[in-house]
């Protein structure tokens, strides 16, 4: 009773929220899940992104943004900015609010949580600079220097380059 490796699963179905729905969020909704287990290389990441972009393209969506992230890059950015390793979880919880409260709100909440204003400013400035530099992994790797393991930036570059080379519809890739 062993699963093949890699194991791939696709399911589409109704799901329900356990929590109380908020404005614009429904208790029941349809969701698509694609899972790949047991693939240690970047191929799983590439395949998942391509499945998503191909599907969106066939549904007629164009000019959308695929947002990818890598926790080790966020950690390197936090270390570069002066946050202590034991504070990363708190910093990332606040950072996750970026879409709701904006960069200024994130910066303010970091400071309100007791973090140095200089660290908060430096951290948020990195995101602005990254956007200004076209979400370039090479730029970020150079900027972060020894704070970022070379393997991390190489893997992310491989994923982005592979997806861009085979893209099935018009879309942008952004580090988020």
Question: Where in this protein do the model-derived segments appear?
Answer:
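N-terminal entry module detector
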Residues: 53, 65-66, 78, 82-87
């Amino acid at each position: 009773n062993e699963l093949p490796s890699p194991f791939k699963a696709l399911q589409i179905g109704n799901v329900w929220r356990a929590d109380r729905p908020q404005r614009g969020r429904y208790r029941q909704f349809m969701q698509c899940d694609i899972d790949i287990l047991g693939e240690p290389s970047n191929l799983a990441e590439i395949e998942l992104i391509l499945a998503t972009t191909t599907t969106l393209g066939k549904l007629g969506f164009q000019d959308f943004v695929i947002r990818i992230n890598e926790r080790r890059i966020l950690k390197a950015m936090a270390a570069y900015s002066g946050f202590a390793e034991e504070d990363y979880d708190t910093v990332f919880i606040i950072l996750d609010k970026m879409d709701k409260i904006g960069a200024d709100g994130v910066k303010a909440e970091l400071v309100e949580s007791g973090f140095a204003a200089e660290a908060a400013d430096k951290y948020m400035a990195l995101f602005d600079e990254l956007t200004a530099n076209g979400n370039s992994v090479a730029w970020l790797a150079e900027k972060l220097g020894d704070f970022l393991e070379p393997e991390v930036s190489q893997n992310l570059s491989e994923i982005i380059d592979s997806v861009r080379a085979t893209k099935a519809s018009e879309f942008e890739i952004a580090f988020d």
